[in-house]
Every structure is written in C-alpha cells, then in structure tokens.
C-alpha cells in the first residue's frame, strides 16, 4: 500500500498571529513493506508528518495519497483509512483502562460489525503478533504487566483492526535496554509479516539497527532520505545540524580522529566489534 506525499505543507493556526508552519513542501513515497525511520530535532515536523499520513489532520497545501487515492478527498472512506493505518502515540500504555487484556485489545473493534467470535479471533491474532499467549493473558488486568509488556498490549489494540501500515511515535522511550530490544525485535517481526513500519525515534542506535530507510526532517523540510548507512556516514553534517547519530558511530569517529584505522561508515555494534578484532589481530601479528 504505497504512501505518497506530494508537495505537502502544514501550518498551525493559519491566518492568525500565532501561525506556525510545521511542514513545507515535503514530497516522498513509502512503499509496501518498508521499515522507515523518521528523525529530526524537536520542532522539525516529525509528529505533524505522521498525523498527516494517518489522516488526523489535512495538509494546508499538497496531497497525501494512499494506494493512489487522496485520503482528504470528501468521498474517501475515513473508517477504511483508520483500519489501514494504525497510529501508536508515545507511551500508549498510559491509555490502558479496561479490566482485562482481552477487553482492552477489543475496545477499538466495538463498532466494527464483527461478531463476538470474530472479535475474539482478531484479539487472539493481535496478541500473538506481539508475543503473548492469548489464553494465558486474556483474563488478566493489563495494568499488572511490566512497562514493555503494557506497551505491547497497547499496540495489540491497534493491530486488532489488521492495519497494513503501523506508525510508531518514540516507541522505545522509557524502556530499559532489555525491554527496548524485545520491543524492537517484535516490530521487526511485524515488518517481516508484511506490515509497513514508520517509526519516529530520537534513538539513532535503534534506527541504525532496525530501519532500512531513514528520513530526516529539519525546520519542516525534508533534509535527508536514504539508507541508514548513507544517513549516518555523513557524521559532521548531522552533528552540525543537531541531529543524533548512533553511539557506536561517535566512538568510531573518536578513534578516527586519533589516527586509528576505523572506517567512517560503521553504524552497528557488530561492525565496530569486528573492526576492533581486525585491529587487534594486526597489532599482535
């Protein structure tokens, strides 16, 4: 389900003294099954971008197309849009409120027209997608789980409607290292199942490890668009513009600055360790 933004701009409070242009002339396409990371400083337009893709707001200028159709056209089926595109805001676990996991995950399906059996099947499938045993957790309170588990339950509530696109806003914020890795592995699995992932994150390490394409916004405009290796290899330009880079890329650059034979395109821990092994082997020859 290709997503296309054609010369999209968005202004908050247009025509007033409080007007702020959040996006300006953004054009891009996201293909079926992609895993796209979105980066940028605070105020760069990231949250506005994903709200436009999800159809929560309409562009001031330009168009947003899904499968070639303008999602803001009067005749466009908005209910179908919200089934196709799932949006998970930051800290979604704070929105858990039902008495059981099953009821919470099923909440968004109340007006879907599904029978009780169909709803139960959708809830079961969604919970299994995020790594839960349906029978083991269905009757438990969602509030009794760990932070990472609560977040997975909240995402199951979005997945229950079987979206083809999943948008995640800072999904690993506040998680401990183990919870963060488990969560990202789950997102990888969803992507392998064919779900298009669009993930906003300030965590450059997470994007380097998992996103196959990264979009960088600056001052509401498209600043960079490429593979993780392409984006993070341009170390000094990113740092100059206040955009984060993976910690391992920083470490590699520190060694390069001290004369160590360290390539400038290392962005993964595995690459860094492999290079250190080579350097140690050379030293001990």
Name the predicted role of every residue range.
Residues 219-220:
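Conserved ABC ATPase "signature" C-loop
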Residues 162:
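Conserved catalytic motifs of ABC-family nucleotide-binding domains
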Residues 39-41:
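The feature captures the beta-strand-to-loop junction immediately N-terminal to the Walker
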Residues 166-169:
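Catalytic Walker B motif of ABC-type/P-loop ATPase nucleotide-binding domains
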Residues 54:
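Helix-to-loop junction immediately C-terminal to a conserved catalytic motif
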Residues 63-80:
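ABC ATPase NBD Q-loop/coupling interface
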């Amino acid at each position: 389900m290709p997503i296309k933004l054609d010369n999209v701009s968005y202004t908050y409070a247009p025509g007033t003294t409080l007007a702020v242009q959040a996006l300006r002339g953004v054009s891009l396409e996201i293909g079926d099954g992609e895993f796209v990371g979105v980066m940028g400083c605070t105020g760069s337009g990231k949250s506005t971008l994903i709200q436009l893709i999800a159809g929560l707001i309409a562009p001031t200028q330009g168009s947003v197309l899904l499968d070639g159709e303008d999602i803001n056209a009067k005749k466009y089926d908005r209910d179908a849009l919200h089934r196709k595109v799932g949006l998970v805001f930051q800290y979604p676990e704070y929105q858990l409120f039902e008495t059981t996991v099953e009821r919470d995950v099923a909440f968004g399906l109340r007006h879907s027209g599904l029978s009780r059996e169909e709803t139960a099947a959708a809830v079961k499938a969604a919970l299994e997608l995020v790594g839960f045993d349906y029978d083991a957790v269905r009757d438990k309170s969602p509030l009794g789980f760990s932070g990472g588990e609560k977040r997975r339950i909240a995402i199951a509530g979005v997945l229950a409607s079987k979206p083809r696109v999943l948008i995640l806003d800072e999904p690993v914020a506040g998680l401990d290292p183990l919870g963060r890795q488990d969560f990202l592995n789950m997102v990888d699995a969803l992507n392998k199942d064919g779900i298009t992932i669009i993930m906003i994150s300030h965590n450059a390490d997470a994007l380097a490890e998992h996103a196959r394409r990264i979009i960088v916004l600056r001052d509401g405009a498209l600043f960079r668009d490429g593979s993780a290796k392409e984006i993070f290899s341009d170390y000094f330009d990113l740092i100059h513009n206040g955009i984060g880079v993976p910690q391992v890329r920083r470490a590699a650059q520190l060694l390069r600055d001290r004369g160590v034979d360290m390539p400038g395109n290392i962005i993964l821990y595995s690459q860094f360790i492999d290079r250190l092994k080579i350097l140690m082997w050379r030293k001990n020859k």
